[in-house]
Amino acid sequence: MTELKLLQCRLDGRYDIEDCLGRGSYAEIYMARDRGAADERFRKVVIKALNVLLQGYQDADLERTLIQNFQNEAIALDRVRHPNIISRLGHGTAIDLTGTAFHYIVLEYLGGGDLSMLCRKEALKLDRALFFLQQICAGLAHAHESGVIHRDIKPQNLLLTTNHEIVKIADFGVAKIEAAEGAITRVGTNIYAAPEHNPLVQTAALDPNSRQSAQTQLTPAADIYSLAKTAYTMICGVPPRAFAHHAITELPAPMSLEPWAPSVLRVLERATQARPGERYQRMQDFWDELSDAALPATRPLIATPAPRHISSDLKLEADLVTAAAPPMNVFAKLSSKLSTSCSRVIRIPNSNGR
């Protein structure tokens, strides 16, 4: 494993990298301070750095796919700006202290963790789960209207503000963009992914055509499937492992004993059918059915009805991070030539000047 040397460094002359928040298979996530931010709300940011060497080997084809993955995420985030979708604040290429070239994206910092962390403590009350689900549906509806299918909706990709009042969709790295060429083919997270875009799952029952045909014809129903599996986790407090690659057909106790359980289960079961055509086709339809199914249980808990419409016009009464970003430029390919065209990080001196 070869990690980037970025801690206590300044990236692009403005981002002071303070901490590593985590590492995935091919990316490193850092918290940084933006010295160029005029607004204090934008001062703390997240740097997502692509590192093709994290697995300890190099593969030219994989490298091209990962770079395209990164490019795809930046393009998608520019296209789908919305209060419930993470904001891209910048992007670029740089070289770390060891001379390793890498691509990076600058994202807004939320600070409230993700829904998987929240649900790990205990299942959410139904009205609280619906509060978050309405926001997620609004963000996904806007993405779909903009020609973007996320493909990897799961609790870990749903981030929360510090006060846990706003949820935002993150990680558009495997999103399918309408009319885009060279679609990313990385598998979505299996337990939440719709069968039509997961080549590890036998999907012959989906359609007489090939699995590849199913992958190239992704529709919003794929995200609806994943969101329904996510809703199960939120409501039940456990991942839907018993229904991996299958429709949700029951809720565990004690949720199954709740008066709302049969009607909510019917919605989740329809949304997770193997055949895309048998699911809800629009995010608005899924939300309408789900909120109606839960209405008897939530009516005593909600003083005034929540707004039902979840279109891209949804407005939230909160200060939202929606900074404008420059037009997306295609990332340069990683090569030895990068050293002449991208910035180098510099070490930040400590208090004694070292």
What spans do the regions from the language model cover?
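Short beta-strand micro-motifs within the conserved protein kinase catalytic domain, predominantly
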Residues: 87-103
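Protein kinase catalytic-loop region centered on the HRD/HxD motif
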Residues: 136-148
